[in-house]
Amino acid sequence: ARIECRESEKVYHTVENSGGTLTITQVNKKSWIENLADFGYDYRVTVYLPTGIYNAVDFQCSTGNLSIPEGFVFSSMKAKSTTGNLSLSCGVLGEAELKNTTGNILVDKMSPSSLNASVSTGNITLKNGTVGGALKTSSSTGNTRLENMEADSFDAHASTGNITFSHSVCSGQLKAETSTGNVRFDEADCDTMKVKTSTGNVTGVLLSPKIFYATTSTGKVNVPHSTEGGLAEISTSTGNITITIKE
């Protein structure tokens, strides 16, 4: 392995490899005034590894982005960032657990056995992957988008933000819940679904018929009437519900 660290006179890194754990720590000897003047400087750390299959990994980053390109495969993955983005295009064979406090999560072409992605403030984008089991997402403030994804089940929660399922299909149940955001389906599908919003709309196009049970307090409901397909429970307080089936 080769490690490259961008440093300055008073900001440097220590590297330790102990018990199979690689720890890279940034040491900052600057005063707070010097740090203000240094705002925006890119103290990037790059770890070069041969492409191939690796054992379980656990990435933890306090301040900064984590990016892993294609060509790497891990038996399982945990990745956590406090302030920064997670951008992952690597392969994962087992469970993938991704957490971010402030920042976005972008996952492309990952097909783990299960996937759990959560952020406090930021967007979640998952695309072009097949999850062997459950796919779960959670966001406090930010949008969630699943694009060209497949899984056994979808479970998406958002407090303030939209949830979009675009050309994504699960063989089991789809669950989506948001307080002040919308839920949209762009030619998505599932066996059964349970969708709930407080002030958001539920709209879009599904690929197969459903038996709809749709309720709203002050909004409008426009869904197909069918006796075929799985149960689709949709409820909202002040939003509209508009669903069509692709012909």
Regions found by a protein language model. Give the residues of each.
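Acidic (Asp/Glu) and glycine-rich low-complexity loops/linkers
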Residues: 1-81, 87-100, 104-119, 123-139, ...
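Structural signature of tandem-repeat unit edges
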Residues: 165, 185-186
